[in-house]
Every structure is written in C-alpha cells, then in structure tokens.
C-alpha cells in the first residue's frame, strides 16, 4: 500500500484574540498521497488558508501531529522547516507575491538562491521553466510589465524551481480573469500529470471541480472528503520521480557565496531605490568620519609642525645649566661651567659638536641707527649645534676664539635694521656697547615656535665677549649636539657622569629637546583623543540614525521578507541581508567621509600656510573599520527583527 506523503492527525490551531482563544482548526485528520491533485474548498473564515499555511510549514499547529514523508514537523526547528519549504514545497499565491525590483528570471530563481544552486544552473532552469510556461520572451520583464496571468505563471515557475514536489496553490485564479484563470488551472493539471502533488485552496466549486479529490472544510472542521468522479486526470510516475529528485538536490560548495551575492544585490537595490533617505541616513556617518579623520590629521600635522619648530632651536641637543633645576636661587653663584668642560665634552664619542653660551643684552649702533640686540657669546661650533646657516660671509672660526677677535655674525633681522637691501654688510664695523666689532657673516632667519623670529641677535666669540663686554669667564650654559641615531638618554647620562666627576659634585642639570618632543607628543595625543571622542559621538548618533532607518526599512519590506521565507530563506539569510545593507550604508558613508576629509585638508592648506594636515594610513583604515563596526552594531537589531518575523504575518502585510 502506498505511504501517504502528508499525514495529519488530531490537528488543532488556536489563536489568542485578547483574552479569548479562537479555534480555527479543530481535530483535523487528513492524508494526502504522492501525485494527488487535491482541492481544499471552503468559504472565507472556514480555516482553509490556515490549513494551507500549516501544510506549507509557514505555521505550526497548536496540537496534534503533522508528518511529511513520515517525518514529524513538530520536532523540527526553524531552519529545518525552511529547508522543507525550500526543497519540497512550491507556493502559488493569489496575489502572486513577486518582488517588484526583480525581473521574471530573478523571481523564478529566488528559491534556488537559498537552496545553494549555482548561478548558471539556476538561471538555466529558470529560463527553461519560464519558456515551458510560455514566458520565454518576457524573462527580463519586471512584474509591473506583466499581466496578471503572466505574473501567476512566474510564481508557478518559482514554485517549480527546486522541484516543487508539493505545489500549494492559494486561490490561484482569484485575482485573474476567466481566460487567465483557465490557463493557470491547465498548467496545474499538467503539473499533476507530470507527477507533482498539487493542493489547491479555493472557495470556488468550479476550480475545485478540476481536482481529482475535493476536501470541504467549514468552521475549522473537515465536513467532506470525496473523490471527484468528473476528474479524468492521470499521473505520470516518471515525472513524479523527476520532481522528487529535483527537490532533493544538494547545495553546491559555493552556496554561501550565491546567497551572499544575492543579499549584497538586494541591499544595493534597497539603497538605490531610496537615494535621498539613504543619503540622509549616511549623513551622521559622513560627518563623524570626516571629523575624526580630519581631527587626527590636524593633530598629526600640528605635532609635526611643533617638532619642526623644536628642531629649529637645535637638532638632538642637550643643554647644560648651573644649579639643581629651573628656578634654583643658587644657580647664579655657580661658576663651574667653563671652557675646560667644553673641551672635555668635545672629546667624547657621544658628542657631535658642542658650544658654550652666554646670553646678554646690549645696545648696538651703526651710524645713526641704535637698536637693542641679544648678544650671544658662543663657540665656533655653535652654528652646527643649532643648525643655523650663514647665508652671507662666514661663520665664527676656531681662530676667532683663540685670538679673541672682535668679529660678529648678525641675523637677517639685524641686517634689515642696520643696512639697506643693496648694501653689503660684510666688513662693516658696528659698535656694541663702547667696543667696535666687524661684521663677518649674516645668518639665515630661522623662526621658531618660541617667537624668536622677530628678535635681533648677534653672535660673537665667547673669548672676546667675556673680556670686553661681560666680564666673567663662566658660561650661562653649554649646548651639546648628539650624533644622529644616538639615543639622547645615553648621551645625557654620559654628560652627567663626565661633568659630575670633573666638578666633584652634580651642580648642574640638563635639558634636552627629546624631553620637549615627548611632552609635545603626549599633549597632542591627549588633545587628539579628547577632540576625537567628541567626534565619535557624532558617529554614534549616525549609527542610531542608521538603526532607525533600517527599522523603517524592515517595516516597509515586511512582505518581501515573508516571500523570501516562503520560498525557503533561513533566518540567517534574512539577518545577513539586512546586516549587509547596514554595513554598506556605513561603509559608503565612511568612504564619502574620508574623501571629504581630504577636501578639508586641501582647504586647510590654502587657509593655513605654515602647517599641513597629515593623513595616516592607520587613521583611514581605522575609519573604515569603525564604519563597518557601526554598521554591524547598529544594524543588528533591525536585522534580527527582520529575521524573527512570522512569515504568515509578513505575507499578509501590504
């Protein structure tokens, strides 16, 4: 004896309506055998559609048993039920339920996407099915370009895509004219003859009369189950085998890639169909990413500018001062920094060059011009230590130090005050205090962060200054330049050890540009983090905007979600689709934000001449990662809501 394909016993379906329970199906017992063409007939509200939903695994019974090929559906989880819908059932709906943004081919092959069939195979089969149904010339037409009968035939092709072992037709002719209805019924009869099990749900006795078996349902109970003697249908056993084999096809290895591609395509279509809304959704992300990347670039540019300015006062330099630290009241009485210390330091391997320094202020006169200048009594290596370039004439030489020559190098500011642009200052004699001094060179102006660019400076041999102007032999400080590549900390420790031994006591302290650099880097990093944290708030607000719009999108596309679930989409497929959409919105918004930040950088360079924004790959990659994370975090809730939708309720939405 043939085993039933579908077996229902003592099945009940009860819905909660407020505080009351409504029994829609009551103790249903039913067996349907492979290859049968069955009509379930009843008036509106009789429970026939609810029964069809349970048969198609779109709904679960409240109690009782429902077996498919001997398998109890009550024990199956959501993904296993989706597999049954995908591999065994094909739905034909009264309102067609085609996706408006897909053409006939795309709608027909939808079930195969979730079954993991390769793109080429599903395209070939979809084209074959549509051609068999008389739609060969309409494959690339959207639903809005098809008649009702043509749309219904597309839905039949979709139902057959994965084999369609069981065809569930809900009022298949209800929205069609007489001729189209007859054509659809002819197709269903043909499918039955090919071996498909066809179950038609209808209120129309004329439609039911086309089936070989008629089941009447009223008030949730089966009141009649009879063979239709008027039916003269025959079933092709060979075709039934073909249908079953088609339904049992396994997923290809690249199935996940096909589903991902479909999800990506659907996300893109959803975004482009609401361009303004998508742009407004991106706006918060765009502003946030632009702000973060720009602020980090400004911070990095500012740090580089400050470092450059620090380097302008001496590259890799360590200064030695008398006393224990800044503000030491006894420092003025300490006179141990002398020329012998300079000579000793010069001989050390951790010293590139060294110069003493005594700073004083004097009045300088040339002809009828008198100005106050900073007098810098230094050694011959001063210009190397400080990285200054003598543009005219020559720098100080060791011979000048030895002979206590009354020569000076002036800066470009002093040159501008004393001499006309066309005059040659080299060899001119100026008065500093009451002593005559000969100008031997002009140093290039090297403005720095400490505002030295506007001062007037003069450099002279320390040996001459101590005897003719200052009247003391000890130095205000000694400045050491360390070799490139040598750690300042190593050199600093060597200097401290050497001078402590020479003086017998540590009566000095050191100050290096390295400590300034570290302080600057720490400060700029702190400020960048502070301002970036404010910009991140914009990103969070943008993420909330993405979540809100995605929730709206889920509501708008509820029917689409129901259709996808009906053809076999898993909850994970729906979750993936909406997550991809959220991530795409955020990634594109992040990309636009990065491009805008480059625009901000170009504008910044026009407005601020002495500083450039510095864009780093790390900041840009971080922005992209941040955009993706926002998409995942704020897109998860809407995506989860979409995946948890009840397919029956989703299909009922308009």
From Swiss-Prot:
Protein's UniProt keywords contain Transport: yes
UniProt main location, coarse: membrane
Pfam families: ABC_tran, FtsX, MacB_PCD
Keyword ATP-binding (UniProt): yes
Membrane topology: Multi-pass membrane protein
Family assignment from sequence similarity: Belongs to the ABC transporter superfamily. Macrolide exporter (TC 3.A.1.122) family.
Matches recorded under InterPro entries: AAA+_ATPase, ABC3_permease_C, ABC_transporter-like_ATP-bd, ABC_transporter-like_CS, MacB-like_ATP-bd, MacB_PCD, Macrolide_Exporter_MacB, P-loop_NTPase
PANTHER family: MACROLIDE EXPORT ATP-BINDING_PERMEASE PROTEIN MACB (PTHR30572:SF7), MEMBRANE COMPONENT OF TRANSPORTER-RELATED (PTHR30572)
Subcellular compartments: Cell inner membrane
Species this chain originates from: Hahella chejuensis (strain KCTC 2396)
Membrane-crossing residue ranges in chain numbering: 279-299, 534-554, 584-604, 617-637
GO molecular function: ATP binding; ATP hydrolysis activity; transmembrane transporter activity
Protein name: Macrolide export ATP-binding/permease protein MacB
Residues where ATP binds: 42-49
Coiled coil, from the record: none
Gene Ontology BP annotations: response to antibiotic
GO cellular component annotations of the record: plasma membrane
Subunit structure, as described in the record: Homodimer. Part of the tripartite efflux system MacAB-TolC, which is composed of an inner membrane transporter, MacB, a periplasmic membrane fusion protein, MacA, and an outer membrane component, TolC. The complex forms a large protein conduit and can translocate molecules across both the inner and outer membranes. Interacts with MacA.
Reported function: Part of the tripartite efflux system MacAB-TolC. MacB is a non-canonical ABC transporter that contains transmembrane domains (TMD), which form a pore in the inner membrane, and an ATP-binding domain (NBD), which is responsible for energy generation. Confers resistance against macrolides.
Enzyme Commission code(s) on record: 7.6.2.-
Entries under Gene3D superfamilies matching the protein: P-loop containing nucleotide triphosphate hydrolases
Domain (ABC transporter) ranges: 6-244
Keywords of this entry: Antibiotic resistance, ATP-binding, Cell inner membrane, Cell membrane, Membrane, Nucleotide-binding, Translocase, Transmembrane, Transmembrane helix, Transport
């Amino acid at each position: 004896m043939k085993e039933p394909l579908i077996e229902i016993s003592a099945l009940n379906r009860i819905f909660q309506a407020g505080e009351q329970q409504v029994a829609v199906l009551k103790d249903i017992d039913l067996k349907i055998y492979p290859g049968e063409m069955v009509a379930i007939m009843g008036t509106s509200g009789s429970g026939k559609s609810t029964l069809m939903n349970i048969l198609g695994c779109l709904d679960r019974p409240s109690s009782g048993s429902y077996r498919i090929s001997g398998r109890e559906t009550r024990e199956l989880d959501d993904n296993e039920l989706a597999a049954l819908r995908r591999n065994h059932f094909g739905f034909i709906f009264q309102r067609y339920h085609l996706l408006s943004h897909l053409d006939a081919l795309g709608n027909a092959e939808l079930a195969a996407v979730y079954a993991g069939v390769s793109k080429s195979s599903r395209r070939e089969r979809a084209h074959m099915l549509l051609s068999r149904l008389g739609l060969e010339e309409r494959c690339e037409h959207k639903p809005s370009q098809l008649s009702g009968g043509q749309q219904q035939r597309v839905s039949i092709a979709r139902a057959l895509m994965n084999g369609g072992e069981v065809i569930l037709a809900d009022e298949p002719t209800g929205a069609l004219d007489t001729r189209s209805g007859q054509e659809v019924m002819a197709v269903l009869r043909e499918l039955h003859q090919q071996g498909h099990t066809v179950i038609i749900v209808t209120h129309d006795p004329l439609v039911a009369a086309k089936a070989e078996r008629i089941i009447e349902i009223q008030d949730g109970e089966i009141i009649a189950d009879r063979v239709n003697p008027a039916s003269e249908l025959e079933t092709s056993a060979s075709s039934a085998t073909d249908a079953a084999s088609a339904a049992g096809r396994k997923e290809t290895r690249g199935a996940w890639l096909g589903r991902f591609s479909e999800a990506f395509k659907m996300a893109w279509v959803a975004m482009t169909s609401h361009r303004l809304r998508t742009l407004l959704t991106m706006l918060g992300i765009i502003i946030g990413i632009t702000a973060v990347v720009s602020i980090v670039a400004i911070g990095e540019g500012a740090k580089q500018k400050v470092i450059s300015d620090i380097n302008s006062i001496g590259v890799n330099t360590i200064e030695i001062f008398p006393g224990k630290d800044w503000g030491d009241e006894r420092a003025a009485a300490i006179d141990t920094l002398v020329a012998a210390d300079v000579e000793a330091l010069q001989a050390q391997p951790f010293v590139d060059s060294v110069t003493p320094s005594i700073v004083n202020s004097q009045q300088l006169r040339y002809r009828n011009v008198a100005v106050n200048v900073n007098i810098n009594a230094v050694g011959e290596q001063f210009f190397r230590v400080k990285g200054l370039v003598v543009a005219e004439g020559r720098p100080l030489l060791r011979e000048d130090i030895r002979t206590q020559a009354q020569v000076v190098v002036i800066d470009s500011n002093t040159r501008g005050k004393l001499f006309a642009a066309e005059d040659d200052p080299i060899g001119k004699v100026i008065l500093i205090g009451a002593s005559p001094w000969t100008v031997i060179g002009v140093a290039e102006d090297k403005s720095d962060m400490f505002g030295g660019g506007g001062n007037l400076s003069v450099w002279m041999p320390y040996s001459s200054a101590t005897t003719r102007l200052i009247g003391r032999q000890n130095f205000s400080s000694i400045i050491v330049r360390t070799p490139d590549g040598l750690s300042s900390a190593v050199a600093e420790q060597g200097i401290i050890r050497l001078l402590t031994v020479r003086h017998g006591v540590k009566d000095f302290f050191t100050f290096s540009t390295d400590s300034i650099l570290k302080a600057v880097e720490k400060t700029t990093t702190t400020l960048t983090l502070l301002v970036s944290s404010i910009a991140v708030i914009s990103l969070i607000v943008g993420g909330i905007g993405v979540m809100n719009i995605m929730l709206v999108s889920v509501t708008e596309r509820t029917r689409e979600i129901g259709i996808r679930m009906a053809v076999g989409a898993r909850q994970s497929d729906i979750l993936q689709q909406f997550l991809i959409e959220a991530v795409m919105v955020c990634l594109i918004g992040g990309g636009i934000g990065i491009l805008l930040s480059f625009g901000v950088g170009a504008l910044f360079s026009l407005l601020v001449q002495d500083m450039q924004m510095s864009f780093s790959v790390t900041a840009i990659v971080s922005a992209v990662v941040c955009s993706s994370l926002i998409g995942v975090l704020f897109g998860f809730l809407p995506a989860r809501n979409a995946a948890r939708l009840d397919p029956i309720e989703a299909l009922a939405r308009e």
